[in-house]
């Protein structure tokens, strides 16, 4: 009988440790997701309040977050018509032209965010009075290779 109690107690302790470990893993993932959300929100704020170079760096960073940065779509779309020149060498490691516009960087970020950007890009292409915004939206839609977008235009 004593051995049965020990076995049951051992099983109970093992189960408790398993539950605690699962909770710790879940909590760690939730904390990481919360930290990423905070960083995305900080970069979205930078899109709205920063100088052109800071906005471009924020747009690039958001694009690197892919679909997780979907909350940044509207602020990025609002930059598509911005012709301010930026220097991507200051925040990108890859070889790029020495100069590009903030609107072009925003378009590239929207492409990296992916499919959730399509409706907003179509809206810009159809209704923006700013030619540069329409040009960047058209480029982004082409880069997304979504054949369904052509039927909506």
Residue ranges and their predicted role:
Residues 1-12:
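Bacterial N-terminal signal peptides that target proteins for export
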Residues 11-12, 61, 140, 153:
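A periodicity- and composition-biased signal for non-globular, repetitive helical segments
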Residues 25-35, 53-68, 89-115, 123, ...:
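Structural detector for internal amphipathic alpha-helices that build alpha-solenoid repeat scaffolds
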Residues 10-22:
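Bacterial N-terminal signal peptides
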Residues 33-48, 67-91, 115-126, 146-153:
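Amphipathic alpha-helical scaffolding segments comprising HEAT/armadillo-like alpha-solenoid repeats
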């Amino acid at each position: 009988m004593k051995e049965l109690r020990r076995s049951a107690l051992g099983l109970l302790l093992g189960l408790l440790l398993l539950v605690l470990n699962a909770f710790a893993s879940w909590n760690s993932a939730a904390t990481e997701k919360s930290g990423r959300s905070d960083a995305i929100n900080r970069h979205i704020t930078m899109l709205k309040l920063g100088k052109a170079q800071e906005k471009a760096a924020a747009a690039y960073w958001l694009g690197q977050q892919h679909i997780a940065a979907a909350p940044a779509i509207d602020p990025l779309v609002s930059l598509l018509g911005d012709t301010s020149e930026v220097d991507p060498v200051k925040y990108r490691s890859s070889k790029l032209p020495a100069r590009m516009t903030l609107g072009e960087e925003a378009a590239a970020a929207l492409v990296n965010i992916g499919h959730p950007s399509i409706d907003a890009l179509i809206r810009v292409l159809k209704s923006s009075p700013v030619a540069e915004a329409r040009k960047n939206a058209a480029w982004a839609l082409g880069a997304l290779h979504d054949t369904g977008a052509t039927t909506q235009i």
